[in-house]
Amino acid sequence: RLCLSDYSIFSETIEICPEGHNYCFKKFPKGITRLPWVIRGCAATCPKPEAQVYVDCCARDKCNR
């Protein structure tokens, strides 16, 4: 799986996920959708949502844009 570890309208950084990490995710505080508060990466399971933190989890290459 290929996931984004960083993304902007100008560039993106791709991370090759280790074996067994089949999900891409992004998470950020609710109400703030811009960097530097967005965290992206690979995961073996979808991260659990936290209070006041939005989590988006997907299972396609580079789907955590």
From Swiss-Prot:
Location(s) in or outside the cell: Secreted
Main location: secreted
SUPFAM superfamilies: Snake toxin-like
Cystine connections: 3-24, 17-42, 46-57, 58-63
Keywords for this protein: Blood coagulation cascade inhibiting toxin, Disulfide bond, Hemostasis impairing toxin, Neurotoxin, Secreted, Toxin
Pfam families in the record: Toxin_cobra-type (PF21947)
Tissues in which the UniProt entry reports expression: Expressed by the venom gland.
A GO CC annotation given for this chain: extracellular region
Superkingdom of the organism of origin: Eukaryota
GO biological process: venom-mediated suppression of blood coagulation
Gene Ontology molecular function: toxin activity
Keyword Acyltransferase among record annotations: no
Function: Has anticoagulant activity, since it is able to inhibit the activation of coagulation factor X (F10) by coagulation factor VIIa (F7) (IC(50)=123.8 nM). Also shows weak irreversible neurotoxicity.
Entry similarity comment: Belongs to the three-finger toxin family. Short-chain subfamily. Orphan group I sub-subfamily.
Protein name as catalogued: Ringhalexin
